[in-house]
């Protein structure tokens, strides 16, 4: 199907329905939870609800529409994407993939500086053509009515988008969270077309020789992000270099904050979906807790994200009715077998760049990456968490330019 321009326009009755539900919310009691130990704090949520009632979606809609949005159909799936051309005569095509609980809007602050660097104090020679798609079943890549859609299938859809729909013979890839998995899989499955892979989450490791059953936490579940050519597995403290010991300690504590949603999303997401599809406040509580737990914010979520951005995030999920299909995509992704690359030699030669943030969820020892991939760029950021381009856009912009500058 041909690519068509897309103007985002949510019907006013849907906005009014959201406000009505917010005004008639019945909140559960909450006590002794100032530190969010039991989940989203009620006092913060009440304040957020009031802001959301007064929130002007049309402002965000106009901001989204200020970018060039398009839609197409690939594998009978609706695919939304932003496509902004870079300045100069030879911008590098770069597709950026998001994860969960992200949306395409997590890249909003980095798109224009990457496409038009000279307007932001940069060098026009660093320009990119930027493509930011919404994952199938997320945001405006809806409605999703096909079962079985997952990350590996998405990888091949992205390749078709870049090569067949947009006409790029070779292109660069980047991503975080599930977007990192997709970016890495593009390099594994289509290495002849990939210029380089840039990740803001490095996960995946070889199984330790003396694997202990209680050597938790996992660097990933079995199917998530095979960054290293080999089976992913749990990491032991001994796998980390002395200067990386605190990474393992962070891994132990921070991965625990992900287990609750992973358990539900990978077992019975539809049961949760009935609640969150009906209650915008329930949806907000579910998403906000993860954003707080996985970002660098000193216990205050709004040190990492503005309240408006958080309302944008939850509104995109709510107004597109996409929580349930995003969770279904999650379920299938964790049950997808990762196939070995058809050309392992070429796949291993793909240049790899990794940015490590101090408050991310998962970490991989640098030596494991160096031994098993063509690592040419490694950055350890001084701040930031799991949502790099949204939390620290300037660090993201500077670092991704540095990596791909080596490949121009």
Residue ranges and their predicted role:
Residues 100-114:
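The serine-hydrolase catalytic nucleophile loop
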């Amino acid at each position: 199907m041909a690519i068509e321009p897309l103007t985002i326009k949510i019907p006013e009755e849907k906005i009014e329905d959201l406000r009505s539900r917010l005004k008639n919310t019945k909140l559960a009691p909450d006590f002794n939870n100032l530190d969010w130990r039991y989940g989203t704090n009620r006092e913060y949520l009440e304040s957020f609800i009031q802001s959301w009632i007064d929130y002007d979606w049309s402002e965000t809609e106009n901001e989204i529409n200020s970018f060039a949005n398009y839609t197409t159909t690939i594998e009978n799936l609706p695919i939304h994407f932003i496509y902004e051309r870079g300045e100069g005569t030879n911008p590098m095509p770069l597709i950026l993939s998001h994860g969960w609980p992200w949306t395409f809007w997590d890249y909003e602050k980095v798109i224009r500086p990457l496409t038009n660097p000279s307007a932001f104090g940069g060098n026009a020679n660093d320009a990119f053509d930027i493509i930011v798609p919404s994952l199938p079943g997320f945001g405006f890549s809806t409605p999703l009515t096909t079962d079985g859609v997952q990350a590996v299938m998405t990888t091949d859809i992205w390749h078709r988008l870049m090569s067949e729909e947009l006409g790029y013979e070779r292109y660069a890839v980047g991503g975080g969270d599930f977007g990192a998995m997709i970016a890495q899989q593009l390099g594994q499955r289509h290495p002849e077309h990939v210029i380089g892979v840039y990740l803001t989450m490095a996960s995946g490791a070889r199984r330790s020789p003396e694997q202990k059953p209680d050597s938790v936490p996992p660097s990933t579940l079995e199917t998530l992000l095979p960054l290293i050519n080999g089976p992913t597995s749990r990491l032991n403290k001994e796998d980390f270099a002395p200067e990386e010991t605190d990474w393992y300690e962070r891994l132990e504590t921070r991965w625990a904050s992900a287990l609750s949603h992973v358990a539900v999303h990978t077992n019975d997401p539809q049961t949760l979906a009935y609640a969150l599809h009906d209650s915008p406040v329930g949806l907000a509580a579910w998403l906000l807790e993860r954003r707080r737990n996985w970002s660098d914010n000193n216990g205050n979520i709004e040190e990492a994200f503005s309240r408006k951005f958080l309302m944008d995030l939850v509104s995109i999920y709510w107004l597109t009715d996409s929580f349930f299909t995003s969770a279904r995509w999650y379920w299938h992704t964790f049950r997808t077998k990762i196939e070995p690359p058809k050309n392992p030699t070429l796949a291993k030669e793909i240049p790899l760049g990794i940015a490590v943030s101090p408050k991310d969820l998962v970490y991989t020892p640098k030596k494991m990456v160096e031994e098993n991939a063509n690592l040419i760029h490694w950055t350890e950021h001084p701040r930031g968490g799991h949502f790099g381009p949204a939390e620290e856009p300037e660090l993201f912009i500077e670092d991704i330019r540095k990596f791909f500058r080596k490949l121009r």
